[in-house]
Amino acid sequence: GVIELTKMIVQEMGKNALTSYSL
């Protein structure tokens, strides 16, 4: 569903954000 897809996108964005901040 859309909600599940949105959650996946948010998680991916979160991972990218954490990686950027770590660098």
Swiss-Prot record:
Keywords: Disulfide bond, Secreted, Toxin. The keyword Disulfide bond applies. It is found in: Secreted. The keyword Translocase does not apply. Its main location: secreted. Contains 7 disulfide bonds. It comes from the Eukaryota. One of its GO terms (molecular function) is toxin activity. GO terms for cellular component: extracellular region. Belongs to the phospholipase A2 family. Group II subfamily. This is Basic phospholipase A2 homolog.
